[in-house]
Amino acid sequence: MNGEAMPEMPMDILAIQKCIPHRYPFLLIDRVIELNVNVNIVAIKQVSISDGVLAGHFPGNPVFPGVLIVEGIAQAAAVLGHLSHPDGLRQCYLTEISEARFRRPVVPGDTMVLNARIAKRRPPFFWFEADCSVNGEIAAEVKLSAYIK
C-alpha cells in the first residue's frame, strides 16, 4: 500500500474523490463498503431516475447503459489500484475491456454492487476481473486492464 492511511469503511464520496479524479456527473460510485488492499473492492452505485443519462436511455423504459456499468466498475478498480499501488495513483488509464457480458437490465431503484478483484499485476499495469450485481443477481461481468502510474 502507498504511504496514505487506510480509509475507514465505508468510504464516503469525499474519501473516494481523494482516490480518483472523477467528479459529478461522471463519478459513478457512491461509496465503498469493502476494500482489501492488493486483493479486491466492493463499491455501491444507487441508480436513480434523476440520473441524467436515463432521460434519453430510453424514454418511457429507462435502462442504465451497460457502458456506464463498466465505467462504474472501472472507477471502483481505480480506487483499489490507487490504494494498492506503492506510490499511490496519479493517473489511471483503462487499457483493455474484454469478455464483457450483460446478464440483466439495471433500472432506476436498483442498487449496483460493483466488485473488482486484482487478477494480476505488473506495475504499472493491473488486470482486474469484475462484476456488477443487483439483488444478488449478476447484471454484468467484465475483465479490465489499466495503466496506473
Where are the regions that the model predicts?
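Beta-strand-rich interaction surfaces with strong enrichment in secreted/lumenal proteins
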Residues: 17, 60, 102-104
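Flexible, low-complexity linker/boundary loops enriched in proline and small hydrophobic residues
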Residues: 2-33, 145
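HotDog/MaoC-like acyl-thioester-processing domains
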Residues: 8, 37-38, 42, 106-110, ...
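Compact, glycine-rich, soluble single-domain proteins
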Residues: 48-51, 55-81, 94
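Hydrophobic beta-strand-centered segment that forms part of the acyl-chain substrate-binding groove
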Residues: 4-10, 77-113, 139-141, 147
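Conserved positions in beta-strands of structured domains
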Residues: 30-33, 98, 103, 115-119
